[in-house]
């Protein structure tokens, strides 16, 4: 009688156990089992606030929108509600981008001066002049302070400067080409996902916070959604399209504004019924 080493028996048992587990896994994987998955905070916020992350179908991006704050748009004497696109939802946080360009401002006041987002005049204008003109004190309190990461220009290596903490800011090249936010992932090409209208009803150039090819230039998006890396910093013909993070739990300060799509279509919300009965004639 040939003796079998104990190690062989253990190894054989191990191989048998592994084989049995593989067979069980194959059997289980052939069925679609109902599994209870707890909702994430993002999913809960989407259902509780009625807002969703951007969706892309057949190359067309659709964003949910809200009204929040008021600013001069169609004229310089009357403020109108600001419409924002929802770029992302995470719990009670909504990352918002203005649906259209809201103003024309230079990135910096001194031409050909080395500048970054941290030191530019537009950052000050957004967080002082615009913030105070567009939002009430309660609305300002609902806007979250955001740690803004200022990366170098990946194409040219231009210095992006130090990170900042802002309530209102501009998108970066990386954010304006982030498909999770509904944008075309290729920055240097035409894209309807990046087209923004001016208040006069024409598509315009809008500024980003990222540096351009040189330290005295800034990145921007043109009227057909193409990304540029050499905008003049003191030019006052480029538009401002603000971004911010809103605390959605301040629900009395904002309201749903329907949906917009990159193909130009607009889906307005259904008006809420009034409690006042219609007159009978």
Protein language model regions, located:
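N-terminal secretory signal peptides that target proteins for export/translocation
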Residues: 1-13
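Hydrophobic core
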Residues: 22-30
């Amino acid at each position: 009688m040939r003796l079998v080493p104990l190690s062989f028996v253990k190894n054989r048992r191990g191989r048998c156990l592994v084989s049995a587990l593989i067979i069980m896994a194959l059997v289980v994987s052939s069925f679609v089992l109902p599994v209870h998955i707890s909702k994430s905070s993002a999913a809960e916020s989407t259902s509780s606030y009625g807002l969703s992350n951007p969706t892309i179908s057949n190359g067309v991006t659709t964003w949910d929108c809200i009204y929040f704050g008021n600013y001069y748009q169609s004229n310089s004497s009357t403020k109108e509600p600001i419409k924002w696109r929802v770029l992302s939802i995470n719990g009670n946080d909504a990352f918002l981008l203005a649906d259209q360009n809201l103003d024309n401002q230079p990135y910096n006041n001194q031409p050909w001066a080395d500048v970054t987002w941290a030191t530019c005049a537009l950052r000050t204008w957004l967080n002082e002049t615009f913030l105070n003109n567009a939002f009430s004190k309660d609305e300002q309190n609902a806007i979250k302070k955001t740690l803004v990461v200022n990366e170098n220009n990946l194409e040219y290596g231009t210095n992006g400067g130090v990170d900042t903490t802002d309530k209102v800011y501009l998108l970066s090249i990386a954010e304006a080409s982030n498909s999770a936010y509904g944008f075309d992932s290729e920055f240097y090409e035409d894209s309807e996902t990046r087209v923004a209208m001016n208040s006069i009803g024409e598509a315009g150039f809008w500024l980003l916070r990222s540096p351009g090819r040189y330290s005295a230039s800034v990145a921007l998006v043109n009227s057909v959604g193409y990304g540029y890396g050499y905008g003049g910093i003191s030019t006052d013909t480029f538009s401002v399209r603000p971004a911010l993070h809103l605390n959605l739990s301040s629900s009395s300060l904002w309201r749903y504004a329907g949906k917009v799509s990159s193909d130009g279509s607009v889906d307005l919300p259904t008006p809420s019924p009034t409690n006042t009965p219609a007159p009978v004639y």
